[in-house]
Regions:
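Catalytic cores of the polymerase beta-like nucleotidyltransferase superfamily
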Residues: 2-472
Length: 472
């Protein structure tokens, strides 16, 4: 458990020391400002016991080992970190040799996962910045590689702690905490930026965005989640370079999009993405949706509900979320297909496939999510069928609850009459007799059952055939 802090007092005290120059214990040999425990208040006990076991083991074997990145940032902001990452001078193979329950993962960026009970600690080796202009007699092509746009394809050039700090993206994510001494090492003024609530890219922002365009998304995500301002020099190139996101593999882009939408600050993130022109590189259909009054209200309601659930510690279905983002594009594609003479339901399925195929070119939505999204969408016309056995059969579907929640969102946004949502709420909560009373009368003449023809060998007519699913 993290110790309790008087956040307001600690932050004011820390800012005063930053501005007066009294914060730092010393400037270390490596060039880092070393901040003593008495000046930041983050105790060793605030770190996960599994992570402490990893850093203690590495340090006992003579390697440097620090807690790095977001965990240090969050602890200094008096937040509870979601997880803890470790950076070390040990190579992946050396780390693997120290921990029996560990494995090396990744190709673009090799790291080691160390398993400790149910916890997995991510351990990375100090990296050096890749010199895109250098070619190598030492096989640098195998350790570091960029594409024609400058995007890093492989990043396994090892270095020292200072080099590792310099190759990180934002100053606030380039802080190192030593659990043994309880000191924070700050190479790029990250602590000052934290307390001035500023996001600043390390190095030349244009070059850093070319190396990894996802850094633009990360800057916007952190700005929304932390309620920070993006430094002018860091913000300025974003709109101009947004097209570089087209070169990012769709699977990686999907992962980053999921982080954006499940951050608990999705509404603010989408607003910032639109402001910086980044949504066009992520969800090419989103701009069209948000230009439609009903579509914008629907999407924003979905994101607000998502933020509320996440902040309350409740689970969220990524499939449901993406189904809401793309629903109005499905609607827009559905009606023209139906107008071409294709029956309503086949036309709906064709529209779903079109929208998902177009989206797949930018964002690799996993098949398991795509299947769930189609189930949610395909249920929507069936909610309008409130007679006979159809409502009972709809209730039995495994994804009924997701489809029902989706229906309520459509009603709340004004797309459908709220009476339909209220009816389904009553119907699912009602008992048997009450459900029968709620059912609507069948529309149109009742279809006659067809009887099979008598058998040819004189065995008499067979029993009447059971009604088809369409008839019942």
């Amino acid at each position: 458990m993290c110790p309790r802090y008087n956040s307001s007092h600690m932050i004011k005290k820390l800012i005063g020391r930053v501005l007066s120059g009294k914060l730092f214990k010393s400037r270390g040999k490596s060039g880092a400002h070393v901040i003593a425990f008495k000046n930041h208040g983050v105790a060793r006990e605030a770190i996960s016991t599994c992570v402490l076991s990893v850093t203690d083991t590495l340090q006992a074997r003579g390697y440097a080992a620090f807690v790095v990145g977001g965990a240090v940032r969050d602890l200094l902001l008096k937040r509870t970190p979601k997880d803890f990452d470790v950076a070390t001078s040990a190579t992946p193979e050396e780390v693997r040799g120290l921990f029996r329950r560990s494995r090396i993962v990744g190709r673009r960026f090799q790291i080691v996962h160390v398993m400790c009970g149910r916890e997995t600690v991510e351990v990375s080796t100090f990296r050096a910045a890749h010199d895109a202009g250098a070619d190598s007699a030492e096989g640098t092509d195998e350790r570091a590689r960029t594409d024609e746009h400058g995007r890093i394809l492989r990043d396994n050039v090892f270095g020292n702690q200072q080099q590792d700090a310099t190759r990180r993206d934002l100053t606030i994510n380039a802080l190192f905490y030593n659990p043994a001494t309880q000191e924070v090492h700050d190479y790029h003024g990250g602590v000052k930026d934290l307390h001035e609530r500023r996001l600043r890219m390390i190095g030349d922002p244009v070059q850093r965005y070319r190396e990894d365009p996802v850094r633009m998304l990360r800057a916007v995500r952190f700005a929304a989640a932390l309620d920070f301002e993006i430094d002018a020099a860091t913000r300025q190139p974003i709109r101009e370079l947004a097209d570089l996101l087209q070169n990012v593999p769709p699977a990686r882009l999907f992962d980053e999009t999921l982080k954006l939408l499940l951050s608990g600050h999705a509404v603010e993130t989408v607003k910032r993405l639109r402001k910086d022109g980044l949504h066009r590189g992520l969800l090419p259909l989103l701009d069209v949706i948000l230009e439609q009054p009903l579509g914008e209200r629907f999407v924003m309601l979905a994101l607000q509900n998502t933020d509320t659930r996440i902040r309350a510690g409740k689970g969220v279905s990524p499939a449901f979320l993406f189904a809401t983002l793309l629903w109005h594009e499905v609607l827009s594609a559905w009606k023209p297909i139906e107008a071409d003479g294709i029956p309503a339901i086949p036309a709906l399925f064709k529209a779903m496939d079109q929208v998902l195929q177009l989206q797949a070119e930018k964002l690799a939505i996993p098949r398991r999510y795509g299947g769930d999204m189609k189930e949610i969408w395909s249920m929507q016309p069936r909610f309008e069928q409130r007679s006979g056995r159809r409502p009972h059969r709809l209730l039995e579907l495994p994804r009924f609850r997701a489809g029902y929640d989706f229906l309520l969102l459509r009603c709340e946004s004004g797309e459908l009459d709220s009476e339909l949502g209220k009816w389904w709420t009553q119907f699912q909560d009602a008992g048997g007799a009450e459900r029968e009373r709620l059912l609507m009368p069948e529309s149109g003449p009742k279809k006659r059952r067809r009887r099979k023809k008598p058998r040819a060998h004189g065995e008499g007519a067979s029993a009447p055939a059971a009604p088809s699913a369409q008839e019942s």
